[in-house]
Amino acid sequence: MIRAPIDRVLQVAADVERWPQILSHYRWVRFLERRNGGGTVEMAAWRPFGAFRYPTWWVSEMIVDRGAREIRYRHVRGITRRMDVVWRLVAEPGGVAVTIVHEWAGPAWPFIGALAARLVIGPVFIHGIASRTLAGIKKHAERA
């Protein structure tokens, strides 16, 4: 639960270019192409493992649907190519519930793609980065 107005939470979550300033695990975020309500965005983040940080990188098509209070991503480059992500924001008493749903069959690697996604890439990298991102969005939105 994020204890902030839903419009503020949506604004912080959608303002991806500011993420490196408010989320220490993001290396950079830049729009490669802007369109009304989103565009093509390149993102790079660190996945920390204690003192070691593993670099990650991907490009997504991003759509911000303010009416539905959703932010959708379709990963188009990087190891997570073809992954669909949706952030859903729902106003509830006392704040905003945010869910992040990732749908992905895994990389197109013969024999091991789905297994690698299920055992390593999803739980270790995707969940590791997404959970830190959501925690940082919460902290920033509640402070603003």
Segment roles from a protein language model:
Residues 1-5, 44-48, 63-65, 76, ...:
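Solvent-exposed residues in well-ordered beta-strands and their adjoining turns
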Residues 9-13, 19, 62, 89, ...:
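Hydrophobic pocket/interface hotspot
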Residues 15-18, 94, 130:
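Amphipathic alpha-helical protein-protein interaction surfaces
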Residues 5-11, 54, 125, 129, ...:
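Short amphipathic alpha-helical segments
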Residues 20, 30-78, 131-144:
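Glycine-rich portal/gate segments that line the openings of hydrophobic small-molecule binding cavities
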Residues 1-40:
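Hydrophobic ligand-binding cavity/cleft-lining segments
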Residues 1, 55-61, 84-86:
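Well-ordered beta-strand positions in beta-sheet-rich domains
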Residues 74-127, 137:
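Beta-strand/loop substructures that line and gate deep hydrophobic ligand-binding cavities in soluble
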